[in-house]
């Protein structure tokens, strides 16, 4: 039969490319689980009262090329002016070798957070390099593996100071008035939520205040002033006040390390180490502190440990500080950080090395010096006495100067009274200097750059006082001194990549993580200069393309969530939780009900939920779950009744973290609303809702959306992420705002939770592309096939690994929990042993012991085809057979392929004294013989790692 032109155009072809199982495979799987078709399957699984009566109106699918063409037209509406705005965001030259081999490489951007260190050694080494870079630049003892952005890091620094302070009666945090305004905004938001008083004043008056537990200073102020705070920090230390300092990594190449000057905590943005501005993000923040504060440190810390063979290996250290273990008692709610961006920044330092970084820093500083000298020769007043890269220039007619600059395609900072700000960066050139002289002085300035350069070099006093110059060397470890050719760097990055297991190698079936395809067409636009090169505070008329993209994406998300408004600012899921809970608090306060601070959270909740509630100033109360894994309605009613007028909210996840669609979810919402509370529906499992139901239709008031789960942004090995929040109309006035940029379409007057007004804006094109190419029907089909895949695995494995929770008709949602406790009781083999043995079979383990200890939670996503599902099923069945051989005594419990897993190449060629063969150890299936993933290390010794904390690069002799 002849096809029509419309059929031949195949505009919905991407749907089949995104969804793994073919229609034929889907029918085979449906037959296996006892359903005639996908609609029948949904009818049996999803409660009828929450199923949408019609598809969300977001339009039809389109082809990859059509979506790219449409997005290219949107991007063309952005205007890429040269930015001299500064304020923590700078032009960069991302080395092409890093862009191609890391930023654009699925081996780097599709991996998950390195909870399984044996399959993450490459990424962990790159993060250790980032930590070493941070330690060298800051002069402190302990560094983390990135935070969300500089402003968030400042808020975390305040939290650390409060936790670690010996001044337990003190409740005031001092902020120097020349800290970046967006940083002040975010810190004040956090302080308000946790009951901390804030003073913003001239830093010289910090010592006058007596009730301080901490102080926030900025080494190079927002207007460019370079400060010597040594005497101030000495006086504060004598009083027990903790000093936190914001710093610029490029400035630190030339300036004395703040830790050596007396700072206790140092943080900043690593953006200018090779990461584009991207209209505000994503960017990695660095964070370092003194050894004494290690237990109060926020975020991930990579530590050097050893494996079962005694070889050096890397892991995430001191995880007992974190939300997935400590819950509401955690140091922070941080889950996703900015791993991919931290790795780019660290690799930038590896590529340039100490000499290359110094050359870049000196050139940037020289350009500022030349401009300053030329202006001073012409009688122009500078408001700076010492500087690194930024000058504040007094001008009689600021509007005219800004307008002239626009004529040259240049943006200057324009929010200063009677002055403009000019910040140089790696991209600044001689031509820019010429243009700036003309803008500020007119065409006939007659200044010669080379002459000015000579005068700057001959000057007796520099713009950086000698006492503030760095004297100690930086980046002395060999890793920063051997990969300066592109060939060497390319091979180093490839060697690291091979040590990791990412989606380009195998399925990553982590429950509650949604490791779906991040399609190439979705990723391509993020490096377009029209998206990558914009400053977040550029004039709004230069960002019309971004504004259009953001408004379209927000409208689509409104339709897909059933809410009335969406705020795109939060740049992680945990930050979205925090923002949503703050909206609830502010709403209650606006109604004169500020006493509503009790937050009910089911026992099965993600660890971020109680951590976020605590951060938002709420008290956490746990609600019981019944034997079927559902919220215990009797317990909920009683706790809601007891809370009464103190009830603020409930945080629920849907489908539940137990992997089922709770039949009573609407009743849960009604109970909470009855007692005056709000319903926060965690969007972690939104991949099982899209196109089928919505949080708003269910009855929730606010949700965050993990765009790095449901909407195809890659996990990046632990970030970036995006966690925008959807809200009902009554909460819309209480979502985050921004003191620098007015958020179009939102009436909020609230403080910011992120440094940039739209969070990590430059990765939002990924979700735009995903939704545009899938369309309403494709998105519904994706959710449905995700449910099909999970049920196929549950049915195939359920006979040997009991599925802990099922719905009333025996089905699961988009993930299933395999109960390993009976096996462990019979054989002694643990969930950890099974997880590590899966590495030998070429798989990343499912989520271990969450939400129930002794289990594995499996989420296959819609992108995995039947062959990959069958490969995973075969691996799990083979592992069960191996457990049986231990159980029957064929293999001793102390020496078998499970407890010894994973097996390395080094082990294969060494002495072999095990009761099982080498082939079974490393090639347990035919597929592993054809495409083998080799772990770089054996199982890690976690106890050793925490007892011997080392978060810096070890000497090369340790790896010999």
Curated annotation (Swiss-Prot):
InterPro entries registered for this protein in UniProt: GcvP (IPR003437), GDC-P_C (IPR049316), GDC-P_N (IPR049315), GDC_P (IPR020581), PyrdxlP-dep_Trfase (IPR015424), PyrdxlP-dep_Trfase_major (IPR015421), PyrdxlP-dep_Trfase_small (IPR015422)
User: Where on the tree of life does the source sit, at the highest rank?
Assistant: Bacteria
Q: What is its EC number?
A: 1.4.4.2
A Gene Ontology biological process term: glycine decarboxylation via glycine cleavage system
Q: Which PANTHER family match?
A: GLYCINE DEHYDROGENASE (DECARBOXYLATING), GLYCINE DEHYDROGENASE, DECARBOXYLATING
Quaternary structure annotation from Swiss-Prot or TrEMBL = The glycine cleavage system is composed of four proteins: P, T, L and H.
Q: Which NCBIfam families match?
A: gcvP, PRK04366.1
Q: What is this protein called?
A: Glycine dehydrogenase (decarboxylating)
Q: Which organism is it from?
A: Edwardsiella ictaluri (strain 93-146)
- Tell me the name of the encoding gene: gcvP
